Amino acid sequence: MEEKTKTVPFYKLFSFSDSTDVLLMIVGSIGAIGNGVGFPLMTLLFGDLIDSIGQNQSNKDIVEIVSKVCLKFVYLGLGTLGAAFLQVACWMITGERQAARIRSLYLKTILRQDIGFFDVETSTGEVVGRMSGDTVLILEAMGEKVGKFIQLIATFVGGFVLAFVKGWLLTLVMLVSIPLLAIAGAAMPIIVTRASSREQAAYAKASTVVEQTLGSIRTVASFTGEKQAMKSYREFINLAYRASVKQGFSMGLGLGVVFFVFFCSYALAIWFGGEMILKKGYTGGEVVNVMVTVVASSMSLGQTTPCLTAFAAGKAAAYKMFETIERKPSIDAFDLNGKVLEDIRGEIELRDVCFSYPARPMEEVFGGFSLLIPSGATAALVGESGSGKSSVISLIERFYDPSSGSVLIDGVNLKEFQLKWIRGKIGLVSQEPVLFSSSIMENIGYGKENATVEEIQAAAKLANAANFIDKLPRGLETLVGEHGTQLSGGQKQRIAIARAILKDPRILLLDEATSALDAESERVVQEALDRVMMSRTTVIVAHRLSTVRNADMIAVIHRGKIVEEGSHSELLKDHEGAYAQLIRLQKIKKEPKRLESSNELRDRSINRGSSRNIRTRVHDDDSVSVLGLLGRQENTEISREQSRNVSITRIAALNKPETTILILGTLLGAVNGTIFPIFGILFAKVIEAFFKPPHDMKRDSRFWSMIFVLLGVASLIVYPMHTYLFAVAGGRLIQRIRVMCFEKVVHMEVGWFDDPENSSGTIGSRLSADAALIKTLVGDSLSLSVKNAAAAVSGLIIAFTASWKLAVIILVMIPLIGINGYLQIKFIKGFTADAKAKYEEASQVANDAVGSIRTVASFCAEEKVMEMYKKRCEDTIKSGIKQGLISGVGFGISFFVLYSVYASCFYVGARLVKAGRTNFNDVFQVFLALTMTAIGISQASSFAPDSSKAKGAAASIFGIIDGKSMIDSRDESGLVLENVKGDIELCHISFTYQTRPDVQIFRDLCFAIRAGQTVALVGESGSGKSTVISLLQRFYDPDSGHITLDRVELKKLQLKWVRQQMGLVGQEPVLFNDTIRSNIAYGKGGDEASEAEIIAAAELANAHGFISSIQQGYDTVVGERGIQLSGGQKQRVAIARAIVKEPKILLLDEATSALDAESERVVQDALDRVMVNRTTVVVAHRLSTIKNADVIAVVKNGVIVEKGTHETLINIEGGVYASLVQLHISASS
């Protein structure tokens, strides 16, 4: 049993209403009651009408008598108009207002939570999901649905009061049918919802497969994992198909039962009503009045289910949100209590600190850690990855509080300060700069409230960012994209530094702050930082010792303890000391060449933001990326237009295998459509029978009640069969389309994904939303049109045979009744359905803020985020209110029109009867046949899908299906070599990325790699080193020239086989949200790797040790993108994955860059063992990795300018390699 869903009591939903809301709710409720009572009053008038026509058929004054009743209809219509308007408008407006208030309160509360809350209790996805999804559910539960509920209950109560007054005995007999009607009406939505949530759950899992696969498409392609992805995708899609068929069948069954009970209740009433007319002296009109009122009132009770479902969903959604809103954080960003001093000197002390992260309370980071940093000093923290260096920074920022011990600034416990004030004195620049989806100016402006443009420009200048910003077409106004994807890593880092400079803090915290820069920018930024660090207390966390050297004090941290402390020169004296060992690990012989990590880390960061986004990956070229984008957008617009027109026949063709099912379904649909018009004739016959002489009446009423039972039985059979058949046809179509699309996408060439239009999110939503819309185009629309056509034809035939004159007059007004029926159902379903889309933009603000909560916290930008959020919401609230008013007017008018049409019809009928052109029975037959037809059609149509959207969806889906993959991994043709030696040659290669055709990466690149050699590629960031690796794996094909493997051109070899010969370890290891075991086994293509092979690979990659030390060992789930492991651990799992593959050619793209010196040494040893007898291509900055390569090739301006061994190249006077090395030596010292 799953635990019971927690909910809040219904009245609590309204706990955030103000006096205006209370007034709106009261007025809205009064309107709803008035509107609800309108229907029973209408049946009362209908009964009077029947009597006045039935009893005065031969009377000269029939027109006068009838017109009096008709006038009452018009008055009733006017009254209902006002009531309905107040009901809808007031409830929609108050719902919109209160939901907006809850939404911003929730965001505000989220922003004030301590960081631990985000580690343990929530995620960006959850927050955004709640803000866009859950608040819509809450809005539905407290808006128009409440009005609707009050209206339906008023109809129910009013109807029964009236029925008892008019004929209590008949009413009592009919009460038998109420529970059945109400139960049938209520059970259907529950069963349907259950099936639909199963379907949604299966689809959600399928979407995760899509997101994971496309988000790491390079890894999937490199390890030929397309088949695995397809397999798991198919499994989930099949589950969803089964659920959707169940849903279709249960919906049909529900409807069938409802109509069966409905017709049987009429049968009972007709038989018993006849008895009442004979024995108790009822009139025909009274019997009809009671019949219609009781059935309609009972139905109205059944119609409350959508409201009750909405209330339940809203109460459940509110529980989590309100719980968060009421949560008091242990570290509260909005708490203004606490000390505020004139200024601080900046002395920092950690005293006996014990600390573990909330997400891993059992693993202690510090147990009694102490550290003192004098004010104005620069302190550096060094140590291996995972030793606790960044934790010190988090504690100083008070992201967390220690479990015992204290953190002091100027001798005052951090907890005693006002949090906002003390954070305002601390500036943080971290390793992965976090930018918000807004302009560069706004991003820098986060550093200081109300900063002027001059101040922002000065800060940018100081951070060495002004140059590249000026080159951008829109300068400071340039939008940086989500997470800053439009900029390279180095550019993002400089903006982050400018943001910290603008803040002018007393304490500066630099967490690997220059790691993302290449040597040149690093030198300049380091100078900027040196200027900024003057007379401030600075804490530096770094791998790279060049940054650390000049620090006043260096603390070496090992497993949460300080093992050594002192200045660079002091610590070097102890040769066996931890610091000296770290230095030794980083040095090669006597050269302190940190060439390595500067670029190394820089590229890692560039890539970190967007492993999918080639644009940032390759180039630090500033304006090109933006211009390239603009040029490309125009092209895509054109291609989009062309794909817009997709004929329905083409979609229908996909449904061809289900032809028989569709034909059967269509026939049943036709039968289904005639049920309502037949009901109209039967009802007219019944009314006629009630005014016959007693003997005939008794016989007729029995006969017609039997016919009604048969009609009920027909409904019970036809409805479920009809919906089941269409559910099967539609479900199979969706299944087919989704699988076709995903298969196509997975096998597209990697370059296709560089286009932002083909990002994993976009494709994911196209697969889910568009496929669902297409189903509506074929299955649902077809079933609907058949049903409606049958209803229309049968209704017209019946009406015209009865009295063509009256039929023509009523036909003119029928569209109005149809519109009314349509609006009524729309209202039951809710006008708020499209509220979700409106909040997308505002959600992005929340998404950004929560995703980078540490940045928001450290810059005290909570208020700023709230302002931005509220600004984006203003229009939404206005449009919500406008929508409320419009819906209210529409809803009110529709009632008025309906009642006026009724009045006109009977008035005209009475005149025709008086003139002797028709008789009383025919008037009712025409009226009921046509109105029932209209109601049937409009009810069906209101569930009609939006076909215009579906056409767009079809175009988008066929756009994918028709796409041609330039490099298709399904292509089985091509040679397979028996024995691979591993000779590689690149001949005259020219290459540009499609997304940036104006940036030439290679011009005539020539280069040979002999079998078994280790070749290192070096060059500055953006020179195209990683591109070589992409070309070798055929992620791209060169524009001209060719690449050969063992003298055979790559294009002639079977693609899948080629990729199986190569093992890639990239700079950012991409792991899947699965166990460590299955991540390693992925290298073998999933299932084939044995336990022994997996462990052997892990041992070789120096990963077995840390895997065994984790509680679940190889069964540990690594989390989304491997988030549960540290960088070094992820990298080792990735290396193990490549080893399991036993590749002939090894491609290492910055494979050890993410590791600290200690792990790097061990992994490097592992790689050295793996590289034996394999052709290896290494891209790296670190000389330790490059030095022992057989050949070093220096790439510059798209060609190879130097190649040879380390010894040869270093001795070339003024050579590129020598100057690269020199640059880094000077950067280090």
Swiss-Prot record:
GO cellular component: membrane
Amino-acid positions noted as binding ATP 1 in the UniProt annotation, renumbered to this chain: G383, E384, S385, G386, S387, G388, K389, S390
Residues bearing glycans: N56, N450, N645, N758, N1073, N1173
InterPro entries, per database record: AAA+_ATPase (IPR003593), ABC1_TM_dom (IPR011527), ABC1_TM_sf (IPR036640), ABC_transporter-like_ATP-bd (IPR003439), ABC_transporter-like_CS (IPR017871), P-loop_NTPase (IPR027417), Type_1_exporter (IPR039421)
ABC transporter domain sequence ranges: 348-584, 984-1222
Bilayer disposition of the protein: Multi-pass membrane protein
Alphabetically ordered keywords of this record: ATP-binding, Glycoprotein, Membrane, Nucleotide-binding, Repeat, Transmembrane, Transmembrane helix, Transport
Domain ABC transmembrane type-1: from-to ranges: 25-313, 662-949
Residue positions binding ATP 2: G1019, E1020, S1021, G1022, S1023, G1024, K1025, S1026
Stored CDD domains: ABC_6TM_Pgp_ABCB1_D1_like, ABC_6TM_Pgp_ABCB1_D2_like, ABC_MTABC3_MDL1_MDL2
Location of the protein in the cell: Membrane
SMART domains named among the record's database cross-references: AAA
Stored Gene3D superfamilies: ABC transporter type 1, transmembrane domain, P-loop containing nucleotide triphosphate hydrolases
Signal peptide range in chain numbering: none
Record region (Disordered): 594-614
Family according to the record: Belongs to the ABC transporter superfamily. ABCB family. Multidrug resistance exporter (TC 3.A.1.201) subfamily.
Name of this chain's protein: ABC transporter B family member 3
Organism this protein belongs to: Arabidopsis thaliana (Mouse-ear cress)
